[in-house]
Swiss-Prot record:
Its main location: cytoplasm. The lineage of its organism: Bacteria, Pseudomonadati, Bdellovibrionota, Bdellovibrionia, Bdellovibrionales. InterPro entries: Urocanase, Urocanase-like, Urocanase_C, Urocanase_central_sf, Urocanase_CS, Urocanase_N, Urocanase_Rossmann-like, Urocanase_sf. The keyword Manganese does not apply. Pfam families: Urocanase, Urocanase_C, Urocanase_N. GO terms for molecular function: urocanate hydratase activity. It is found in: Cytoplasm. GO terms for cellular component: cytoplasm. This is Urocanate hydratase. It comes from Bdellovibrio bacteriovorus (strain ATCC 15356 / DSM 50701 / NCIMB 9529 / HD100). The gene is hutU.
């Protein structure tokens, strides 16, 4: 990858700008925040998370992006193509300051093979979801969605209570690292298997995992002790899940909940085959890509066979959106899709309400600014008990990574309310600098991903990606600060298209108008999408909240 080992990137903080406006300054700080070593998985290679999800195509492009943002006027827009800055256009003050298109390929050519060829030539970059769109906030970014999934699983299968229950999972990377803490927040014990010891160490340091077991017997003894006491604890175990899951079956261990967040979306760089360490896998990959891919696919097949066996033994089993089932099916596991994805199982009712991951970042770098926003959120939504519980636990347990940030799931109507309130806090000087508001591309109306967010849609429209494109167009029209349109995030090349928006609350009247437009229209796309697919809940929400569908 030609990494730059000596270079350490961190976002500037404070209320002094180096750019010509706070909107440009926000993008300038957030791309650098994505590469802060406490956030990024491999910052020396510009890799933020998710296998090879990058913030910029190469170091030259990264430097040019920073230079361009410093020069950018308040009525200009920077264009970025797969992590490479292309040019600056005169637009207008309410237009986005940056428009990004990452990893997009014509469908017939949308394969890892073709992408890898282009990547080798320096013509492409994998943007994942929030890596190439500059709004990754570390593992907290996914944690509330994971928490919501576990809590909903508890509601559906365990009478609303996960106390004394065990969640078994694998993968402690940028996304998967949220699982142990989310499980503990939901009241369960978590056993998380991870092949890379540096990732385990990182999660331990940031308090996302409580303990590390020395071996499988030690892990099981700890789990037994904590579940008997009704204590919620998370334990990491170094190992390969393709091996460990079968050892657990031999030991007659069946968890209550079973899922996986290894980097199966990228079989070449993300998933480590059975029998290899991170180092030996790297050598193997460099020596023989074809043989490596076969080994990875064989391991994924074995991994999924173990999951299916545990499902048959009573474990509530679901896919966590990394495309593991599809890989296993390609490797010969015909019934790999016998267990559902997490969205149809637990998240879709939230999507019907225009609910999704609303995140905000304090550009000042001062953690107290997030404390101020947390308190303001409590006053704004006193009736949302799960949200209040989440804010309390997040304050207590979540270590900030890079610029201080918070995430929570908010519905249609609530997002605009929160955005305007943040803008007011900036205007009144209650926070020390503007606030950046964004979200994951995993949202109610911004993604087409038939093996994840749009799996098993009621009307069979799983693969229709017009909605993601419309979402990007709508957010551009409404004046988001930067808008991104990506391909392949979460599940890999050929399997998804998705859009993101980021908007800055700088305390001005103009910002208030933009915030109201963007934070209303963005979740409205989710209500439209699900209403169109025939979901009654989306129909009811549209009627109740005045969403102007032409099909009510």
């Amino acid at each position: 990858m030609g990494g730059n080992m000596s270079r350490v990137v961190k976002a500037p903080t404070g209320n002094k700008m180096v750019c010509k406006g706070w909107l440009q300054e926000a993008a300038y700080r957030m791309i650098q925040n994505n590469l802060d070593p406490v956030i990024a998985e491999h910052p020396e290679n510009l890799v933020v998370y998710g296998g090879i999800g990058k913030a910029a195509r190469n170091w030259e492009s990264f430097d040019k992006i920073l230079e361009a943002l410093k020069e950018l006027e308040n009525d200009e827009t920077l264009l970025v193509q797969s992590g490479k800055p292309i040019g600056i256009l005169k637009t207008h003050e309410d237009a986005p300051r940056v428009l990004l298109a990452n990893s997009n390929l014509v469908p017939k050519w949308a394969t890892w093979e073709h992408f890898n060829e282009l990547d080798k030539k320096g013509l492409m970059m994998y943007g994942q979801m929030t890596a190439g769109s500059w709004i990754y906030i570390g593992t907290q970014g996914i944690i509330q969605g994971t928490y919501e999934s576990f809590v909903e699983a508890g509601r559906q299968h365990f009478g609303g209570n996960l106390t004394g229950r065990v969640i078994l999972t694998a993968g402690l990377g940028g996304m998967g690292g949220a699982q142990p803490l989310a499980g503990v927040f939901a009241g369960a014990c978590v056993l998380a298997v991870e092949i890379d010891p540096t990732r385990i160490q990182k999660r331990l340091e940031t308090k996302y995992v409580d303990e590390v077991a020395t071996d499988l017997d030690d892990a099981l003894a700890r789990i037994k002790k904590y579940t008997a006491a009704g204590e919620a604890k998370s334990i990491a175990l170094q190992g390969n899940m393709a091996t460990v899951i079968h050892q657990l079956i031999e030991k007659n261990f069946t968890p209550d909940l079973l899922t996986d967040q290894t980097s199966a979306h990228d079989p070449l760089v993300g998933y480590i085959p059975e029998g290899y360490t991170v180092e030996t896998a790297k050598t193997f990959r460099e020596q023989d890509q074809k043989a490596y891919l076969k080994a990875a696919y064989d391991s994924m097949a074995k991994h999924v066979r173990g999951m299916l066996a545990m499902k048959d033994r009573g474990a509530v089993t679901f896919d966590y959106g990394n495309n593991l089932r599809a890989r296993a099916q390609e490797a010969g596991v015909e019934n790999a899709f016998d267990y559902p994805g997490f969205v149809p199982a637990f998240i879709r009712p939230l999507f019907c309400k225009g609910s999704g991951p609303f995140r905000w970042v304090a550009l000042s770098g001062d953690p107290n600014d997030i404390k101020v926003t947390d308190d303001a959120m409590r006053k704004l939504f006193p009736h949302k008990k799960d949200l209040l519980r989440w804010l309390d636990m997040a304050e207590e347990r979540i270590a900030f990574q890079g610029l201080p940030a918070r995430i929570c799931w908010l519905e249609y109507g609530e997002r605009a309310k929160a955005g305007l309130m943040f803008n007011q806090l900036v205007a009144e000087g209650k926070v020390k600098a503007p606030i950046v508001i964004g979200r994951d591309h995993l949202d109610c109306g911004s993604v087409a991903s038939p093996n994840r967010e749009t799996e098993a849609m009621k009307d069979g429209s799983d693969a229709v990606s017009d909605w993601a494109l419309l979402n990007a167009l709508v957010n551009t029209a409404c004046g988001a600060t930067w808008v991104s349109l990506h391909h392949g995030g979460g599940v890999g090349m050929g399997y998804s298209q998705h859009a993101g928006q980021v908007i800055v609350a700088d305390g001005t009247e103009k910002a208030a108008r933009r915030l109201e437009r963007v934070l209303t229209a963005d979740p409205a796309m989710g209500v439209f999408r699900h209403l169109d697919a025939g979901y009654e809940l989306a129909h009811d929400i549209a009627k109740e909240r005045g969403v102007r569908s032409l099909w009510l």
